[in-house]
Amino acid sequence: WDIFRTLRDNGYITTGTSEQYFDPEALRFLPDRYVEGTCPHCGSDEARGDQCDNCGRQLDPTDLINPRSRITGSAPVMQPTTHYFLRLSAFQDRLLEWLESRQGWRKHVQNMAIGFTQEGLLDRAITRDLEWGIPLPPEANDLGEGKRIYVWFEAVIGYLSASKEWAQIQGTPEAWRDWWEDPDAETYYFVGKDNIVFHAVIWPCQLMGYEGLNLPTDVPANQFVTFKGDKASASRGVGRPIGWYTERLQPDAIRFAIASALPEQNDTDLSDEEIIRRVNDELVATWGNLVNRVLSMTARHFEGAVPPTQALADSDADLLASVDATLSETAELIAKVDLRAGLRRAMEGAQAVNFYLNAEEPWKSVKADRDRAGTVLATALGAIAGLAVAFAPYLPFSSSQVAAMLGLTRIEEWRRPILAPGTPLGPVVPLFVKLDDDVLDDQDGG
């Protein structure tokens, strides 16, 4: 209740009367999400009273065309009711200035937040006539019985309350301040585009009204993942839950397929065929096969240890330098929250190692020039060690496997590990399973 009380004490929460939809058959006021109708912006007839999933616009129940009760299907009627309101209008100028000053935000996020703010922020009720939800504390309740804090106001506060709870559990109750009050701390809110307004407009207003807490560093909202052209939605049964995939695919295979197709700027249709293609033709063929063939060749010809190296040729030094560049550039892309490009850059690094091997052909030179073959394989192992670091944020499970096969305890730093000659390698196991065409044919999944 700290934020509620502080906002009220600072004059940003006031009491007001509004009209709210009432279901005459159910004899109850309807929460925003219990009112459905046609979106006035895009025409979708499945819009809810708080937002339209189809176009992502935030709505009030009164905005809907031909509203209906989700409980009974009847046409609701308006009745007056008293609520607490958050004075969003008080933050209009300050918020707009802050939004326009953001550097590096995704354009669709910044444009939506600025556009919504420029339309004029309206004071918004933060309570509802409900039987469920967070009740108002008696000392803060001037409204009477039957009022609850509504979800849009309290949900985003969960970020702060979870931080405080974490600090308590750690036995350092003030540690949350390191993240919320230190001006050098950064916060990133990963959401879908239907949550942009809540995280880039409403939550910053709450933080501004509270005073002294860090505003979001970035709100890297994604566009929608679609299935057969329709937006994935658990509530509407479109798409498949992640558990369905984990029963059929390796976790890193799922992560790769999603990360390589992240809808960072546009909606992305993620079909079964596309998932299988990305896993087989990119993850398995490029990265998985590279790791397997280099470690298998080393185990076979150099007693399962990192080979000794002679003086590095230009091609060897160039490869290791390119891997170091891959690490640096991948880190920069991740820092910019350009995650799909970061993964693509890591894959380009793996392709460079494959090109190097095809040019050096250690499987041939091992018979005629064992020293040179050993140097090539040691160089390739070093490159793989560096790439495992670049892949780790995307493919944590298989990256740990690669580290173990290279004789490393774990990946600890964002740099290319140095593999000393003679370092014993772990057992060589395939990282990924090639997918059959029918692996995702289960009809129970969506």
Which residue stretches match the model-derived regions?
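Conserved, charged catalytic cores of large soluble enzymes
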Residues: W1-L121, E165-A175, V291-T330, A350, ...
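Short, amphipathic alpha-helical segments that act as regulatory/interfacial helices
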Residues: F4, P204, V291, L295, ...
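Basic, alpha-helical terminal appendages of large translation-related enzymes
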Residues: G16-Y21, E25-A26, G37-G56, P67-R70, ...
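Secondary-structure capping and boundary motifs in well-ordered enzyme cores
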Residues: P31, G144-R148, D194-N195, Y245-T246, ...
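Structured secondary-structure scaffolds
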Residues: C42, I65-R300, R344-A346
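Helix-loop segments that flank and shape redox-cofactor active sites
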Residues: E139, W176-E186, A305, E332-A335, ...
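Short, mixed-charge aromatic SLiMs
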Residues: P183-T187, V225-A232, D281, A311-A325, ...
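Short, charged/polar, low-complexity loop and linker segments
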Residues: D267-D272, D324-E332
